[in-house]
């Protein structure tokens, strides 16, 4: 299946999108924040404000096709990040995080294909983490940490349901 955005258009391979919740009522889009001892935002969280779209991401797959398919592993990277944040800001799940399975951004020269988008219903998708060493994928959901951040983490059976909103230059 081709992944569709909030306007019903195919999600472009290499396109820029906001990842927003499929259903209102629990926070906004996905963005970066500082947690714990981080001096610079590295950790992927859901915005606390429902009206926030979060930060735009680029979603890319290796097959040189125009659109993103649910069959492929993709890389996800934030595009507009603070100066101190490593670039390119690819999503990654480090082994040494303070919260197990927490999605963070790290510099990765390898173009990491660690994620998949799966259709859940007509207007909702879920993000999954697929470690490169394995064929199995696990749901990404929200866990609230001790600082009340809504962190994006591996949560089997409790996925965050999302949609993809095109990040137009004029809708900043």
UniProtKB/Swiss-Prot annotation:
Gene3D superfamilies xrefs: 2.80.10.50
Pfam families the UniProt entry points to: Kunitz_legume (PF00197)
A GO molecular-function descriptor: serine-type endopeptidase inhibitor activity
Residue spans crossing the bilayer: none
Principal location listed in the UniProt entry: secreted
InterPro entries registered for this protein in UniProt: Kunitz_inhibitor_STI-like_sf, Prot_inh_Kunz-lg
Disulphide bridges, residue numbers: 40-84, 130-137
Keyword Ion transport: no
Site (Reactive bond for factor Xa): 64-65
Subcellular location: Secreted
Signal sequence, renumbered to the chain: none
Keywords: Disulfide bond, Protease inhibitor, Secreted, Serine protease inhibitor
GO CC annotation terms, alphabetical: extracellular region
Matching PANTHER family: KUNITZ TRYPSIN INHIBITOR 2 (PTHR33107), TRYPSIN INHIBITOR A (PTHR33107:SF81)
Protein family according to the UniProt entry: Belongs to the protease inhibitor I3 (leguminous Kunitz-type inhibitor) family.
Role summary: Inhibits bovine trypsin and chymotrypsin, and human plasmin, plasma kallikrein, factor XIIa and factor Xa.
Protein name: Factor Xa inhibitor BuXI
């Amino acid at each position: 299946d081709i992944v569709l955005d909030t306007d019903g258009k195919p999600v472009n391979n290499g396109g820029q999108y906001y990842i927003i919740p499929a259903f209102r009522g629990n926070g906004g889009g996905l963005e970066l924040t500082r947690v714990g001892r981080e001096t610079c935002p590295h950790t992927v969280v859901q915005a606390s404000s429902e009206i926030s779209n979060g930060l735009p991401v680029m979603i890319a797959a290796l097959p040189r096709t125009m659109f993103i398919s649910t069959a492929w592993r993709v890389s996800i990277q934030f595009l507009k990040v603070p100066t101190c944040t490593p670039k390119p800001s690819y999503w990654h799940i480090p082994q040494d995080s303070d919260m197990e399975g927490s999605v963070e951004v790290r510099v990765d020269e390898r173009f990491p294909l660690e994620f998949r988008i799966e259709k859940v219903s007509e207007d909702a998708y879920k993000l999954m983490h697929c470690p490169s060493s394995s064929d199995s994928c696990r749901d990404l959901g929200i866990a609230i940490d001790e600082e009340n951040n809504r962190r994006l983490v591996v949560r089997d059976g409790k996925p965050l349901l999302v949609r993809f909103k095109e990040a137009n230059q004029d809708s900043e």
